[in-house]
């Protein structure tokens, strides 16, 4: 699981 996901992560 990701702790942080970038808002513009593709």
Curated annotation (Swiss-Prot):
Origin superkingdom: Eukaryota
GO biological process: vasoconstriction
UniProt keyword terms in alphabetical order: Vasoactive, Vasoconstrictor
Protein family per UniProt: Belongs to the serpin family.
Protein name, per record: Angiotensin-like peptide 1
Species per Swiss-Prot/TrEMBL record: Bothrops jararaca (Jararaca)
